């Protein structure tokens, strides 16, 4: 009997610790202040969104980004525009709000503001719109987007040279911008034979889906059409060249 009581006490302690850990995982600290973590994986975001007859979907990117591609039924809302507050006032506080941006910076900023205003349920797509596109979920894309590439043509490009480095990213993604000087430095060198290709995720959802890209920047080095190296984040020239030399 005594052993059973001890076992029950231990079990309750474990459950309490686990529960505490789960609660802590939903809280972020910024400048010493606690903020709720609204980040939601694409699958859950998609599932919760589909439960709504008239979902409140907010695109926290710029108007230019929104015009290139956006989630169906999404409303573009930019903190930089004059009628920003008026747009928020049109939302129903008791209904879930679904937010996304190129990553989670701008969408989290809006989410925190909504939370301060008393909105009850908020979801932020993480790690950004690339996760939605990579999962193959619906996306409305401008047919006039000059950065759009036909999937079959892209696959042909991968075999057009022995080494092809593909940079999956976006002009609006801060870390992606840091990749550009790396590629410029790579292209300025004459001691390698690596062709670079840039793929804008917003303009090429079919490519992003087919190659299962869910985070940006993502760089993949191909040799004769086959992937031999992958980097999520900002690489160095040495990493890229080193990956080709190892083959």
Regions found by a protein language model. Give the residues of each.
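Sec-dependent signal peptide recognition
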Residues: 2-9
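Hydrophobic h-region of N-terminal signal peptides that target proteins for export
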Residues: 10-18
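Thiol-based oxidoreductase modules, predominantly thioredoxin-like and allied folds used
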Residues: 76-81, 168, 187, 192-206
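Short cysteine clusters
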Residues: 101, 173-176
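Short pre-active-site segment immediately N-terminal to redox-active cysteine/selenocysteine motifs
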Residues: 161-162, 169-172, 215
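A cytosolic small-molecule/anion-sensing beta-strand core signal
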Residues: 223
């Amino acid at each position: 009997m005594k052993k059973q009581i001890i076992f029950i006490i231990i079990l309750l302690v474990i459950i309490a610790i686990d529960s505490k850990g789960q609660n802590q995982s939903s809280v972020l600290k910024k400048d010493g202040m606690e903020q709720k973590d609204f980040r939601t994986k694409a699958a859950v975001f998609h599932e919760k969104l589909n439960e709504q007859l008239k979902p409140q979907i907010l695109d926290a990117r710029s108007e230019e980004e929104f015009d290139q591609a956006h989630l169906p039924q999404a409303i573009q809302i930019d903190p930089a525009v004059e009628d920003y507050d008026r747009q928020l006032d049109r939302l129903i506080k008791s209904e879930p709000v679904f937010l996304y941006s190129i990553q989670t910076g701008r969408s989290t900023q809006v989410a925190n503001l909504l939370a301060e205003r008393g909105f009850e349920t908020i979801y932020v797509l993480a790690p950004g719109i690339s996760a939605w596109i990579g999962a193959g979920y619906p996306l409305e894309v401008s047919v006039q987007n000059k950065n759009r590439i036909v999937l079959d043509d892209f696959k042909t490009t991968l075999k057009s040279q022995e080494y092809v480095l593909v940079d999956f990213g976006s002009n609006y993604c801060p870390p992606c911008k840091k990749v550009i000087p790396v590629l410029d430095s790579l292209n300025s060198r004459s001691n390698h034979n690596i062709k670079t290709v840039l793929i804008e995720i917003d303009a090429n959802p079919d490519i992003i889906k087919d190659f299962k890209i869910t985070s940006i920047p993502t760089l993949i080095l191909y040799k004769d059409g086959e992937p031999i190296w992958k980097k999520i984040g900002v690489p160095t020239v040495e990493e890229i060249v080193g990956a080709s030399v190892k083959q």
